[in-house]
């Protein structure tokens, strides 16, 4: 595994931002869309940027394998030999890209021993880049400024602010929550961008009931971890990476703090 340095992190940030510029070019014109085997859309932008990221990361760290959402047919028997690898989603929020909402991002993370240790989330249409590295902290670059992202308390007397992907998702989440508490839902596309709402203090958590891949959560996990946050499944267990044949995550919660009694929002008293 490469040594975690600010130089490595800066190189990955630049690669993610370059990938974002390619997405911006595709965004300005009509793109070809087809459905994958899992019935999710993929565009020529996904495929082009996946190849771009693969080439750039290979040049940066030739010894580190790469797993992309668009090139994930690598058997577990081979992946089990990887101690470290790059995990990428070239276009997180493909449907948002197709719908021209601007709510999509590039996700790049470095995973070591089944846990992310470096992550970059770049939102090209928002002009924002979020990045973190183990032991380094979490930061946001926007409008020429680099801002250190800080932990924020959850106000017990206020409604819990929850990021979700749609109004339908909000109702699905509401159905499993403690009905004695108040909630405020914020709708946003792209799994990565929902996690940045938590990092920015707009939301207290992001709850996902539905299909996501490991590439959707890795960069967010290290971002929130460096802020003192937490990601867990509905059995209060951490997410893991590259341990199963499938890349599908369980339902999960991304929270801004480990010190909140998360179990109370799922149980009526």
UniProtKB/Swiss-Prot annotation:
<keyword id="KW-0479">Metal-binding</keyword>
<dbReference type="InterPro" id="IPR020550">
    <property type="entry name" value="Inositol_monophosphatase_CS"/>
</dbReference>
<keyword id="KW-0997">Cell inner membrane</keyword>
<feature type="binding site">
    <location>
        <position position="89"/>
    </location>
    <ligand>
        <name>Mg(2+) 1</name>
    </ligand>
</feature>
<dbReference type="GO" id="GO:0050427">
    <property type="term" value="P:3'-phosphoadenosine 5'-phosphosulfate metabolic process"/>
</dbReference>
<dbReference type="GO" id="GO:0046854">
    <property type="term" value="P:phosphatidylinositol phosphate biosynthetic process"/>
</dbReference>
<dbReference type="Pfam" id="PF00459">
    <property type="entry name" value="Inositol_P"/>
</dbReference>
<feature type="binding site">
    <location>
        <position position="91"/>
    </location>
    <ligand>
        <name>Mg(2+) 1</name>
    </ligand>
</feature>
<dbReference type="InterPro" id="IPR006240">
    <property type="entry name" value="CysQ"/>
</dbReference>
<feature type="binding site">
    <location>
        <position position="89"/>
    </location>
    <ligand>
        <name>Mg(2+) 2</name>
    </ligand>
</feature>
<keyword id="KW-1003">Cell membrane</keyword>
<dbReference type="InterPro" id="IPR050725">
    <property type="entry name" value="CysQ/Inositol_MonoPase"/>
</dbReference>
<dbReference type="InterPro" id="IPR020583">
    <property type="entry name" value="Inositol_monoP_metal-BS"/>
</dbReference>
<feature type="binding site">
    <location>
        <position position="216"/>
    </location>
    <ligand>
        <name>substrate</name>
    </ligand>
</feature>
<comment type="function">
    <text>Converts adenosine-3',5'-bisphosphate (PAP) to AMP.</text>
</comment>
<feature type="binding site">
    <location>
        <position position="69"/>
    </location>
    <ligand>
        <name>substrate</name>
    </ligand>
</feature>
<dbReference type="GO" id="GO:0005886">
    <property type="term" value="C:plasma membrane"/>
</dbReference>
<feature type="binding site">
    <location>
        <position position="92"/>
    </location>
    <ligand>
        <name>Mg(2+) 2</name>
    </ligand>
</feature>
<keyword id="KW-0472">Membrane</keyword>
<protein>
    <recommendedName>
        <fullName>3'(2'),5'-bisphosphate nucleotidase CysQ</fullName>
        <ecNumber>3.1.3.7</ecNumber>
    </recommendedName>
</protein>
<feature type="binding site">
    <location>
        <position position="216"/>
    </location>
    <ligand>
        <name>Mg(2+) 2</name>
    </ligand>
</feature>
<dbReference type="InterPro" id="IPR000760">
    <property type="entry name" value="Inositol_monophosphatase-like"/>
</dbReference>
<feature type="binding site">
    <location>
        <begin position="91"/>
        <end position="94"/>
    </location>
    <ligand>
        <name>substrate</name>
    </ligand>
</feature>
<feature type="binding site">
    <location>
        <position position="69"/>
    </location>
    <ligand>
        <name>Mg(2+) 1</name>
    </ligand>
</feature>
<dbReference type="GO" id="GO:0000103">
    <property type="term" value="P:sulfate assimilation"/>
</dbReference>
<comment type="similarity">
    <text>Belongs to the inositol monophosphatase superfamily. CysQ family.</text>
</comment>
<keyword id="KW-0460">Magnesium</keyword>
<dbReference type="GO" id="GO:0008441">
    <property type="term" value="F:3'(2'),5'-bisphosphate nucleotidase activity"/>
</dbReference>
<keyword id="KW-0378">Hydrolase</keyword>
<dbReference type="GO" id="GO:0000287">
    <property type="term" value="F:magnesium ion binding"/>
</dbReference>
